[in-house]
A protein has these predicted regions:
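Extended, low-complexity cationic-aromatic segments
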Residues: 1-62, 166
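RNase H-like polynucleotidyl transferase catalytic core
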Residues: 14-22, 97-113, 129
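Acidic, metal-coordinating catalytic cores used for nucleic-acid/nucleotide bond scission
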Residues: 53-55, 77-91, 106-111
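Short, basic/hydrophobic alpha-helical segments
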Residues: 57-76
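C-terminal anion-handling pockets and recognition modules
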Residues: 113-169
Length: 169
């Protein structure tokens, strides 16, 4: 749970100290989707956090089921080449329900708008904010991500920064 330090301050001659917990490696894993509806009038962010767990194929499938339930429509899914996204369960269970599945090229995070979301969260609202327990870290990550859900300018910026032609309104 080591925080990203962007800026520090201390009196001249005194080294700044940022306290952090160093005994256990705890983390919050996340999965997210930035959705563009057919009307292209609003951009939506859906996410799930998993405290002290990895995002595996089962969790990715659960997230996709939740996403399809929320959207009430077949989706075109564009995913990175993360191994949990390429499991046979995904192809068997998700493809029949969704319209189309495409993968981004491997090692191309600059084409993935969700990567820009994570970078923004780590370097802005969550920077310089150490969490001393897993509950606090999860709460701060959830609050920071929810704050982005209502920022159309940021969500559109993440999409436009990829350079993909998405025809946003």
């Amino acid at each position: 749970m080591a925080p990203l330090v962007r800026r520090s301050w201390s009196l001249r001659g005194h080294t700044p100290v940022l306290r952090q917990r160093g005994r256990a490696l705890q983390k919050v894993s996340a999965i997210a989707a930035i959705c563009i509806p057919p009307k292209r009038d609003q951009v939506a962010l859906y996410f799930r956090l998993h405290a002290d767990a990895n995002v595996n194929t089962e969790r990715a499938m659960d997230f996709l089921g939740h996403l399809q339930h929320q959207l009430h429509t077949p989706i075109v899914l564009v995913w990175d080449s993360f191994q949990a996204h390429k499991g046979e369960l995904i192809n068997e269970c998700v493809l029949p329900r969704s319209a189309h599945l495409e993968y981004l090229p491997p090692y191309a995070p600059e084409l993935n708008p969700v990567e820009y979301l994570w970078a923004y969260l780590k370097t802005n609202p969550l920077a310089n904010d150490p969490a001393f327990d897993l509950h606090t870290l999860t709460h701060r990550a959830r609050c920071a991500t929810r704050s982005v859900q209502h920022r159309q300018d940021l969500l559109r910026g993440f999409l436009q920064h990829t350079g993909l032609s998405l025809r946003l309104a």
